[in-house]
């Protein structure tokens, strides 16, 4: 291929649905994307399971998707890495984990396990929590307390009760008691909405919340009030009108979420800095996290450190002296920067980053356009100026609005993306760019369960890939997300590094 400039457009959450009645994308008016099937070479990509480094049958997500897209290979995800470590006994013998356990044992301190209790596999997995309680039991600990964050976003909105019952039944032959229950909306914020985080902080450290006899009754009560898992207000398990356990100075805490973004804030308020305006003060804790949430955190131990990914697309472009732009709205900005760069925070030489602020609304069904038009207005002039050799652009709508499960809003989200993509592709073709139009995973393609209830999770469906070029009309074969980067380098006429083990999808 000659020296092409390329644009990767990621329509986040846009999959190929198999059930028309559940597929907001098929129900939406998408004249532009629909027209591409007849005009340009296209195929599908797998975004889930072992093809993206997850366990078989595990749905993909934005973090995994962008890592694979940028790395040009299958990137083994923390979920799979931890599953294997449990199987081989590597987790039980892990130095950071053992030092937390031994600290609690030697100093007769409580050990708290914090995290998302579900099998969503995006942020955590209930099997990891069960393994941790078993390891604590083998070590002879008896003061083990679980602070359960309920999901309802990567799992069905009312699946939390089942997960809590599954955990309770495991604890009967293991060690540990559930001390509090809080919806992830509060405990796992990532947008610096400290007023939400404060509810979780006060529950964990002061026992502030609805007093309940057990975790299951807290969830049942929430359901009775029509509150789903994600939004459950803190509930505190009490005995004799006192919380059975709160996090106190000197305790050991293990946060078992493996995805780094959504337990960063709760870790920050517990261990890193005071927020006096919210009456949140850091505690001296023996604090351990499953993975490294933030490399600037002090006195936080890490069970699994990152394997550094080298020779990602961004790094190869830097080595070739090429310029690149990464652009997204707030919700997906870390994905086109940090994750697309293989877990690297710092921009590459020649890389510019552009962000449009996501709208400040409680949930995105209230503004399904999100900031797509602003993004488009920012990137089209850059394309017209041909200011970058490569552009990575993410439209968040089909995913973020899909997560609300609101059908009409999802349709509006998809239609917004269609019109924005049309503007980008038109500008690209006028200015000599080749566009790779794809998605990182599905979501809006399956929004209704068989019983008609909303499905808010990602899907296992493949996603489309269009290669849109003024002249090129070759064959493109089906593949996986990790095949995109080498295919882009092929179009740009840049040698593909051996580390990029993905396939080139064109002949």
Task: Indicate where each model-derived feature is located.
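Feature captures the catalytic ectodomains and active-site-proximal regions of enzymes
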Residues: 1-507
């Amino acid at each position: 291929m000659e020296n092409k400039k390329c644009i990767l457009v990621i329509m986040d959450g846009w999959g190929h649905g198999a059930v028309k009645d559940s597929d907001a994308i098929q129900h939406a008016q998408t004249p532009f994307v629909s027209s591409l099937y007849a005009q340009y070479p296209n195929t599908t990509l797998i975004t889930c399971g072992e093809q993206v480094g997850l366990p078989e049958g595990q749905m993909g997500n934005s973090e995994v998707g962008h890592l694979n897209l940028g790395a040009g290979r299958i990137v083994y995800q923390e979920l799979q890495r931890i599953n294997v470590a449990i199987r081989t006994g590597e987790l039980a013998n892990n130095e950071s984990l053992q030092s937390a356990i031994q600290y609690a044992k030697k100093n007769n301190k409580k050990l708290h396990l914090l995290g998302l209790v579900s099998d969503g596999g995006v942020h955590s997995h209930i099997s990891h929590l069960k393994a941790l309680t078993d390891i604590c039991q083998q070590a002879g600990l008896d003061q083990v307390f679980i602070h359960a964050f309920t999901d309802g976003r990567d799992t069905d909105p009312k699946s939390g009760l089942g997960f809590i019952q599954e955990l309770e039944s495991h604890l009967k032959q293991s060690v540990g008691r559930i001390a509090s229950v809080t919806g992830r909306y509060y405990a796992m914020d990532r947008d610096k909405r400290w007023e939400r985080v404060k509810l979780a902080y006060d529950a964990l450290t002061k026992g502030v919340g609805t007093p309940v006899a057990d975790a299951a009754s807290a969830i049942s009560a929430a359901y009775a009030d029509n509150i789903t898992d994600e939004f459950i207000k803190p509930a505190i398990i009490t005995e004799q009108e006192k919380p059975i356990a709160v996090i106190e100075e000197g305790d050991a805490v293990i946060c078992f979420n493996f995805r780094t973004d959504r337990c960063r804030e709760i870790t920050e308020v517990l261990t890193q800095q005071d927020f006096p305006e919210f009456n949140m003060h850091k505690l001296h804790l023996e604090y351990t996290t499953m993975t490294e949430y933030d490399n600037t955190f002090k006195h936080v131990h890490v069970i699994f450190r990152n394997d550094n990914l080298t020779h990602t697309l961004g790094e190869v472009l830097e080595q070739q002296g090429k310029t690149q732009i990464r652009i997204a709205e707030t919700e997906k900005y870390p994905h086109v920067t940090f994750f697309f760069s293989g877990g690297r925070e710092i921009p590459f030489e020649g890389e510019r980053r552009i962000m449009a602020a996501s709208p400040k609304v409680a949930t995105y069904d209230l503004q399904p356009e999100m900031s797509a038009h602003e993004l488009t207005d920012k990137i089209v002039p850059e394309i017209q100026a041909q200011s970058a050799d490569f552009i990575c652009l993410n439209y968040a709508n089909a995913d973020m609005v899909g997560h609300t499960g609101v059908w009409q809003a999802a349709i509006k989200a998809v239609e917004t993306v269609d019109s924005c993509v049309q503007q980008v592709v038109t500008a690209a073709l006028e200015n000599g760019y080749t566009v790779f139009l794809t998605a990182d995973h599905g979501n809006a393609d399956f929004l209704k369960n068989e019983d008609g209830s909303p499905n808010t999770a990602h899907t296992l469906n493949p996603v489309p890939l269009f290669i849109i070029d003024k002249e090129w009309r070759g064959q493109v074969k089906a593949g996986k997300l990790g095949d995109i980067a080498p295919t882009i380098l092929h179009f740009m006429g840049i040698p593909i590094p051996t580390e990029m083990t993905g396939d080139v999808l064109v002949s």
